[in-house]
Amino acid sequence: EDAWHTRYQDSMRADGLILLGYGDWTTYEARLRELMRQGTHFARWGSVSSESSGATIGSDNLGAGRLVGEHLLDEGRRRIAFIGHADGHYPEFAHRYDGLCEVLRAAGIEPDPALQRDAITTEEAGLSATRDLIASGAGFDAIFAGSDLIAIGALRALAEAGLKVPGDVAVVGFDDI
């Protein structure tokens, strides 16, 4: 199993690999270093980091989080929830959340931990996290979903609760589906 990439490269079916990941690149960093050591050509889609191995293609997630925060504040939103893992294991989500928090603090608003819910990038996770957020009574007027799939689940939960989008709650997704 550990030599899959060598067998693939030796087959001459491709000149290189494109590796897709969503936060899980940290788990496979040792394998990526091994690919480099063996001379396997690859590019990785994911969070850009100075510690990551190989060529990386990704988004400016921190900057995007700032833009979302600025947009929602410009729209008059002040209680902005974030749905998506904000820990380091999902660096894309964490950077988006960090950008949002920077903008909130610059506007004199301390981010409320009660408005953050962990969710992986699925519709069901967004649905569940938003239901939980609504049930908590924390009170929010916007949701920044870490991905569009999470946002779709959030929209379903808001509709179930009789909340109007964007009237009662603004929703922003990420990924452009």
List each language-model region with its residue ranges.
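Hinge/beta->alpha junction and helix N-cap segments in small-molecule ligand-binding domains
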Residues: 1-4, 23, 57-67, 83-129, ...
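Short helix-capping segments at alpha-helix termini
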Residues: 104-111, 136-139, 160-166
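Short beta-strand segments enriched in small/hydrophobic residues
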Residues: 16-18, 79-86
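Glycine-centered flexible beta-alpha turn that most often forms the glycine-rich phosphate-binding loop
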Residues: 169
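Alpha-helical recognition/docking segments in bacterial nutrient-uptake
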Residues: 1-70, 74, 135, 139
